[in-house]
Design a protein with these regions (language model features):
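Short, Lys/Arg-enriched N-terminal segments with co-localized hydrophobic residues
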Residues: 1-5
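Conserved mixed alpha/beta catalytic, RNA-binding, or beta-rich assembly cores of soluble enzyme
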Residues: 6-68, 88-91, 113, 119-123, ...
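Mid-chain, well-packed structural core segment of small domains
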Residues: 62-93, 97
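Short beta-alpha junction loops
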Residues: 80-84, 111-116
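Short, acidic/small-residue loops that bind anionic groups at enzyme active sites
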Residues: 97-114
């Protein structure tokens, strides 16, 4: 509604392969409401947690979800790195389903837009040809200029 300020608190879970990532692309896209954060166009966003899954098969998912909910998270984003890394996370569907069921929280696959270099490589490899990937990558697809700005 116009005139009413809305606020959402989110947590971000990244792939453990990127545990040393400073989170710059995720935070930039959150600030600019790009990629999967475009759904919050007119909403104030507060980050209440940022951690890794703890590596395959995701030993930290249960704890991270619980901690984020305790910190007030309304939604958890599974970082774009989980879908653009090679290979993409084989547990992403399981993580999403678990967090939604266990904590009754909204789970969004993706953070920043898929960089062009990753889109090109995964297109070449056919990684995302299976129809199951379409809804997973959709929130992080963006126009070409935006994708290139995340290369």
């Amino acid at each position: 509604m116009k005139g009413i300020e809305m606020k959402i608190k989110i947590g971000i879970i990244i792939c453990d392969r990127y545990r040393r990532c400073a989170g710059g692309k995720c935070l930039r896209s959150m600030r600019n409401r790009e990629g999967a954060f475009s759904i919050y166009a007119d909403t104030e966003v507060e980050l209440v947690g940022f951690t890794t899954c703890d590596g395959c098969p995701g030993g930290n998912i249960e704890y991270a979800g619980e901690e984020m909910v305790k910190n007030g998270a309304d939604a958890v984003h599974l970082a774009t790195g989980m879908i653009v890394g090679y290979p993409p996370c084989p547990y992403i569907d399981m993580f999403k389903a678990f967090l939604e069921k266990r904590y009754g929280i909204k789970v969004v696959v993706g953070t920043h837009p898929i960089p062009t270099k990753y889109l090109d490589m995964h297109t070449h490899l056919g990684t995302w040809e299976d129809d199951a990937w379409k809804p997973l990558i959709a929130p992080t697809m963006a126009d070409e200029v935006t994708r290139e700005s995340y290369d």
